[in-house]
Amino acid sequence: MADIKSMFNKMSSPKQNGTGEPAPAKGQKGAIEKIYQKKSQLEHILLRPDTYIGSVERATETMWVYDKVKECMMQKELTSVPDCSFPGLYKIYDEILVNAADNKQRDPKMDVIKIDINQETNTISVYNNGSGIPVVMHKDEKMYVPTMIFGHLLTSSNYNDEEEKVTGGRNGYGAKLCNIFSTKFTVETASKQYKKHFKQTWGSNMTKASEPKIKDSGKDDDFTKIVFSPDLAKFKMEKLEDDIVLLMSRRAYDVAASSQGVKVYLNGERLKINKFKDYVDLYIKGKDDENGQPLKVVYEKVSDRWEVALTISDMGFQQVSFVNSIATTKGGKHVDTVADSVVKNVLEVLKKKNKGGVNIKPYQVKTHMWLFVNCLIVNPTFDSQTKENMTLQAKSFGSKCNLSEKFITAVTKCGLVESVLTWAKFKAQDQLVKASGKKQSKLKGIPKLEDANDAGTKNAHLCTLILTEGDSAKTLAVSGLSVVGRDHYGVFPLEGKPLNVRDASHKQVLENVEINNLIKILGLQYKKKYNSVDDLKTLRYGKVMIMADQDQDGSHIKGLIINFIHHNWPELLKLPFLEEFITPIVKATKKDKEISFYSLPEFEEWKKETENHHTYNIKYYKGLGTSTSKEAKEYFQNMDRHRIRFKYSGPTDDHHIELAFSKKGADQRKEWLTNHMDEVKRRKEIGLSERYLYTKETKTVTYSDFVNLELVLFSNGDNVRSIPSMIDGLKPGQRKVIFTCIKRNDKREVKVAQLAGSVAEHSAYHHGEQSLAMTIVNLAQNYVGSNNINLLEPRGQFGTRLSGGKDSASPRYIFTLMSPLTRLIFHPHDDPLLVHEFEDNQKIEPVYYLPIIPMVLVNGVEGIGTGWSTKIPNYNPRDIAENLRRLLDGEKPKVMHPWYKNFKGNVEGFGDKYVISGEAAILPGDKIEITELPVGTWTHNYKENVLEPMLGTDKVKPLISEYREYNTDTTVRFVVSLLPGKLSEIEAEGIHKVFKLQTTISMTCMNAFDYNCCLEKYDKVEEILREFYDLRVKYYVRRKDYLEGQLQAEADKLSNQARFILKKCDKGLVIENKKRKAMVEELIKRGYAPDPIADWKKRASKIQGLTALEDDDAQESEEEEPEPDPKGKPVDPDKAFQQLKEVKKFNYLLGMSMWMLTKEKKDELLKQRDQKLTELTTLKNKTAPMLWREDLDAFLIKLDEVEDKERREELNVNKKTSKAMAGKKNRKSMFDIIPSENGRRVEPKISDDLIKRIQAAEKAKTRKEIKKEYDPDDPTGISPSSGEKKPKARVKKEKPEKAEKPDKVDKAEKTDGLKQTKLTFKKEPKKKKMTFSGSSSGEMSASDAEVEVLVPRERTNARRAATRVQKYKDGSDDSGSDSEPELLDNKIDSDHEAPQTLSISDEDDDFNIKKNPAKKPAEMDSDCLFDSLIEDAKKDEPQKTLTKSKSESILIRRLNIERQRRCDTSVPPKEKAAPKRKLMNVDKDEKKTKKRPARVMLDQDSDDEDSIFDSKKGKKKTAANPKKKAKKKVESDSESDFNISDSSLSD
């Protein structure tokens, strides 16, 4: 202890420093005091004004001011404007003005503000007629309230952050700063409530003050008037300059605009501003947009707290905004919130209108906006006292700025969208120019380019670039170059189809390698116009020749290249720049004769005109790769025949190119294709062949002819591939699969991959087999939402409703087989009536099948083609069959509604739409059970896109606490647990809406090919049913006629065969040893007809117009060659052919074997004949409708069998599963997939909101309706009122003293994810916690939280009246208010002696402890000081370990008091120790004498941590105010501060 004491004496010696070295000399000491200074707050404000009011340095900046002549706001360069945009002088004026505007919020009756600025007298006055300042003596401060708030720093009525205020005042500086920077400052106010009139004047920068003049005001109205004369010297001015007066005058207009219902007068003249919109008009008056039109302003008063106006800006983003009448010239969170909302909606419009432009980002949209915002924000925060930038987070605004749809629509029409698009177009062109090519002789880095030797040279205009379709075509072209040479011909292969640049995005164009390579090869330059042949000499090639296949895809490639050039350089098409190279599509050869055809219609015409066409060898060329190198050389040798030049025929060509490739021309394209189909139909009816483009004399082709005669075939083919037939409901790919399956007639399952190969072989499928495999998979799928009748059986994993069929296995692993229903739907008796397609001289699938029911309705269809699209829902096959029966009976069909196999939800009609609803039920315990999803909503997608977001994210509040899955591959079951109190809200909103369990199906896009192969639009399902019925009845008549003829022919054949056998057995007919001609003549003479079946088929094909009835018909032309005469004489070919044909007709008799002459065979033939005749009689007795009924009955019986089999298989699986899961736990798991019996079903309803959405979608079909189911801050879609309290987190069981903020709930829910509500927490001690709604981060450390808990804000004034220590055991410091420590400094800096009641020190004299008055601290020796500190430490130790007895405590206290008296120097009674504020107002000599005691008190802070620690354990210790400690570091946390009743240490 002695060593410690000596060390302490050494350190505390005034003659030595901490190291024991001599202290500095007196001269040095003086220099230190000069360097390290302390200023009062008043001195600091005057010395460093930029901290409080902004810079006072002179500068020049452009700002908005009011022009009296033009009566509008103008931008002007103003002097005395500092770097921070506001001069100090302007700021002190603004503080007074904002105070006047704030009074409107306190007194709604206030309606006048008067502002007078007198430059000559340097006087500014601000008057308002709102509630006056209370003219009453402040009980604590012992002064009048006006005196306190205008003459004492850090005084304010805005310190209670618990109160929601929408005023501008906040920190307690405002008006005092104006007082400090004024030579004279007068306050005059009248309070009607207190019936007093008050007036007081300050001077000399608030260092002097007059006595307040108080008088009775009687019944005078309330008012407050501030008159001040700025201290111009402080602002480096000699007088109020014109520029600063202009700025002050504009601020008057600001207040008139931002203060609703207030008349503002400036220098006696009322300002003509009645509303915020009038103020906005002052800014845009006389300003025009880029088209010379006046700017359009879009204005909306969103609520009582928000007004927003917007127009376009050509000077970057501009904003004029006010928060509680404060001009936030730098904006802030309120401006960002509004701007972001506008930008988000504008971007959605821009995405649709700017698909061909550069990628537009949000900040680029904002750059074109000029935003005006006037708002009232609850307790706003700013980044500085100048209040130019509002920093409060949007969640704490106290209100929301929800812009209406009407406002957003008006914004998109005010010119903002056009302005952004213009900028985007300019930006795109600028980037494209950089990507242009140039003329150069050698190019590097372009793979597969075979460059011409003269490309890019002086002879470049003689060069031709050949663009080929793929590498195989390039090989063909290179082979041909050996004929024409490589100097003037280059070759470049295209990989696939070029980009359609007309509607491609700017990014797509820039990143498309093929387009960029083409530009470099040709040397094209964006934005350059090529108007003459001389301009072509600037390119690397003078011509472009397109060498593509002569099929529909090749035509499309040609069109895309034409479109590429026309879109960027339309002038090039007017010059001889573009050509095409055509090759034969069919070649007919006979010996040395070869005929080439360049289109199929031309070949068909030749076949009709040439009788012996069957004697020619026909070869089809599917692509350029089919031609040999020899043929390539032949093509190039006859260049004139194969080279076709494109010719520009006028504006019509431009129109047709845009028609074919512009997305804007969708309606015109539909009309174009419809006209084409009608023309094909008309020519077919009158027996004309299709039109074709290339003839033997064709040398040039106009662009219009190319589009209308060649490119139209591709577009029509696209529709044929994408849109099904109304009759069989199949697309060509699906029809090819069914055709192959019927032809194969497999009895055993076949692998899907193998079946795909077989389809490609038998049906001439020219595309990849992978797409065929997916077509097979789709035909076999049977999950909910796919097929009502799957035509193929799924044997393996063909996909489920979990992922909408995307989870199917590879085609290599799954098998399929034709469904037993397929041949009942596509009846074999209809096969002979089908008209088949032919390709490559091969008979393939029919044009359409003839099902017994309209399969287009059974399985529905979706497809998008060129100019056309279709969507037809599924219907119940039983309903369809029933309606067909009603039509057969002559009755009106019943109305049918969409129906999906195994779908458990609800389908309800609404106008021309249907609402498909899932199934939901309410379970006990605030749970929702979802047991069915809308059709087309797949289980995995629903979980990820709907349920997952409901759990909450960083930006979205949670709606549910968790969800559990009990789904299978065929059923759906989610059990969703809601947050407490949410069920009633969700029920009110609609469970189906909140959980997105409703979708709509439109009935306005039902398009399909009719029986004439023309696209037809159907308005109602009944129209499809009726058209199918009419056609099918005709075909049933034809089927009956065909079957009757077939049975009669078969009976005649059997009868002839039986008669022939009888005659032969009776030896009545001798044919042996006779020539064939004699044999045939003998048979004809005896009445034997040629083959009756073949003869009937021939007649039937002519009558019914069928192209082919049986495969063996095609063999009639393949006759055997006549044998040469043995004598060598030439044979007459026609005569020999005729003889062979006649002989073949009697093969059914002459070709019978000897076994046919037996009696058994004869009897069998007669029996078969009788059976055919019986069948014929039965058939003749039936009508066509009867045949149809029989087919329908057989189909429905089989349908029941198939579905019963599926149910039995499912039941058997469940039984097996039940046995395997015999345990109790397993049984529970099995029953989890079954809907609960305790659920209350929620009846789906069509809400008004859904109706509005449907109607809006109907009005604007081109615009996709985006309906927000959830508010960004509220995923439930329920927007509670701004003042509504949010429910507390479920984990909190005890009742909270104060509702937590929404962000706290978010945090609790997000921390532990799905299982949050399942956790159990240990109950914590009940502590009074406080939320930090104003905190920007929303978080605080644990230690900070404890300090706030222990020092409640409600105890602010309790200390001053305290007489007992017990009242302060939980802490008496008011750490909840940030301004309290500043208030202390303010009072110290005040030049007016305040009453002692304003003391806020921790001394006992503040508590009115009179037993032993506090003494002024004096010098004490080091021993006394050391002893006092040691005793303080000893007093703390026992409390940490054990509890002392009462007598021991008293003894220690007395010893401590005795030592205190020994060490202190007494103070005379008259000089009672002053409060802390008074002590710091003494002169410099007094401050020097107090130097050592201050160091003593600093050392007493060593026990802070222990004190705080003990307070947590429930001891009687109290943590000092941390904010005070940070300021002064002099308070003590020891118990002696509060528990010594006899005496206490003073500062």
Swiss-Prot record:
Residue sites binding ATP per the record: 99, 128, 156-158, 169-176, 385-387
Gene Ontology CC terms, in alphabetical order: nucleus
Additional record remark: Eukaryotic topoisomerase I and II can relax both negative and positive supercoils, whereas prokaryotic enzymes relax only negative supercoils.
Region (Disordered): 8-30, 1107-1134, 1209-1249, 1261-1423, 1459-1547
Domain Topo IIA-type catalytic: 723-1192
Subcellular location: Nucleus
Gene Ontology biological process terms, A to Z: DNA topological change; resolution of meiotic recombination intermediates; sister chromatid segregation
Top EC category: isomerase
Entry's Gene Ontology molecular function annotations: ATP binding; DNA binding; DNA topoisomerase type II (double strand cut, ATP-hydrolyzing) activity; metal ion binding
Record CDD domains: HATPase_TopII-like, TOP4c, TopoIIA_Trans_ScTopoIIA, TOPRIM_TopoIIA
Gene behind the chain: TOP2
Protein name stated in the entry: DNA topoisomerase 2
Alphabetical UniProt keywords: ATP-binding, DNA-binding, Isomerase, Magnesium, Metal-binding, Nucleotide-binding, Nucleus, Topoisomerase
SMART domains for the chain: TOP2c, TOP4c
Function: Control of topological states of DNA by transient breakage and subsequent rejoining of DNA strands. Topoisomerase II makes double-strand breaks.
Taxonomy of the source species: Eukaryota, Metazoa, Ecdysozoa, Arthropoda, Hexapoda
Basic and acidic residues bias: start-end ranges: 1124-1134, 1238-1249, 1294-1315, 1384-1394, 1459-1488
Record-linked PROSITE patterns: TOPO_IIA (PS52040), TOPOISOMERASE_II (PS00177), TOPRIM (PS50880)
Alphabetical list of SUPFAM superfamilies matching this protein: ATPase domain of HSP90 chaperone/DNA topoisomerase II/histidine kinase (SSF55874), Ribosomal protein S5 domain 2-like (SSF54211), Type II DNA topoisomerase (SSF56719)
Catalytic reaction equation(s): ATP-dependent breakage, passage and rejoining of double-stranded DNA
Source organism of this protein record: Bombyx mori (Silk moth)
Enzyme Commission identifier(s): 5.6.2.2
Cofactor note: Binds two Mg(2+) per subunit. The magnesium ions form salt bridges with both the protein and the DNA. Can also accept other divalent metal cations, such as Mn(2+) or Ca(2+).
